Amino acid sequence: MAVPLSLGPVHHIRLTVTDVERSRAFYTELLGFQIAMDAPLPADDPHHDLTVDLLQDGIVMVNGDLLLGLRPVDTQRTNDRFDPFRCGLDHLSFSMASKADLEAAAQAFEERGVVHSEISDLPPFGIAVLPFKDPDGMALELTAPL
């Protein structure tokens, strides 16, 4: 019999991207993430090697309680693109407080030329969603209660 676990909200996510700087701009300028760490600690810091291993030439950003890491794609796979139909991530959804926040986000997307779908109400789940994609084509959405 499985032991029930009491899980909290997602702590962190790491995405593999084709261009860390392009994705950094997208996630900071459009979604409000702040840079938490974008370089290993100094060489004389006892945790230097750990941060080199953990960052993997990428960055870590924060928005509220969520940490989002970006790491570069393996250079041998430069033509690889996100595909929600392969085994792995289908999409990633970020919570917002209200449907009005989704509408404001849709307007900001329009102003910045970010392609997105219309806001859709999903009454069986009690939410509205605003689907869009990041620069690597990863399926994202903003979600708010109805």
Predicted ranges, named:
Residues 63, 67-70, 143-146:
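Short, basic, helix/turn surface patches
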Residues 2-3, 10-18, 59-62, 80-146:
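Vicinal oxygen chelate
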Residues 1, 8-11:
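N-terminal leader/capping segments at the start of a protein or of a new domain
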Residues 43-48, 75-81, 118:
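A short, acidic/glycine-rich surface segment
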Residues 41, 73-74, 145:
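Residue-level structural signal for beta-strand termini and adjacent loop
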Residues 16-67:
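Core segments of cupin and vicinal oxygen chelate
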